[in-house]
Design a protein with these regions (language model features):
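Conserved phosphate-donor/acceptor-positioning beta-strand/loop module used by diverse small-molecule
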Residues: 43-65, 71-79
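Short, polar loop motifs at secondary-structure junctions
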Residues: 34-38
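RNA pseudouridine synthases
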Residues: 24, 40-43
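C-terminal helical "lid" subdomain and adjoining coupling/linker elements of P-loop NTPases
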Residues: 126-134
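Small-molecule kinase domains that catalyze NTP-dependent phosphoryl transfer to phosphate-bearing small molecules
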Residues: 1, 70-113
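Glycine-rich phosphate-binding loops of nucleotide-dependent enzymes
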Residues: 71, 120, 125
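ATP-dependent small-molecule kinase phosphotransfer cores
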Residues: 1-29
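Short, amphipathic alpha-helical "lid/cap" segments that border enzyme active or binding sites
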Residues: 18, 112-120
Length: 134
């Protein structure tokens, strides 16, 4: 039987992040992006899980502009990053990353600021409905 000290460093890092995510959530309202936070908090009440997506061409234009890249380099960067994210998420959660069909928040239509506002408004609305016990 293996012990914590025998674990590969990437597993130790994942467990430390997992614990940190729970500690942050225990301290009060927060926004956590990535790091399998939905998985870490799956047994918590009052959690909102959002997968923000946009069509690839919109993402390419945004990343090309932000990092002053050609569209081809931006697309390559996005695809490599997505592959790493999917591999990490799928490995540690035994779920499939980017199941966007479960969500309906598209930053390609709302933009970054609009998406952030939509999430904030959703949480406020949901809290008001919960408080009213409808």
């Amino acid at each position: 039987s293996g012990s914590y000290s025998d674990m590969p460093i990437n597993h130790k890092i994942f467990l430390a992040q997992f614990d940190a995510i729970k500690k942050i959530a225990d301290e009060g309202p927060c926004v956590l992006v990535g790091r399998c936070a939905d998985y870490a908090l799956e047994n918590y009440d009052n959690v909102v899980n959002v997968f923000i997506y946009a069509d690839l061409d919109i993402r390419v234009r945004r990343i090309a502009r932000l990092y002053n890249l050609t569209d081809a380099k931006a697309k390559d960067m996005i695809l490599k990053t997505d592959k790493k994210r999917a591999s990490y998420y799928n490995y540690y959660t035994n779920k499939e990353w980017a199941e966007a069909k479960s969500y309906d928040l598209n930053s390609g239509k709302l933009g970054v600021e609009g998406t952030a506002k939509a999430i904030k408004d959703y949480v406020s609305l949901r809290n008001n409905i919960t408080d009213a016990k409808l």
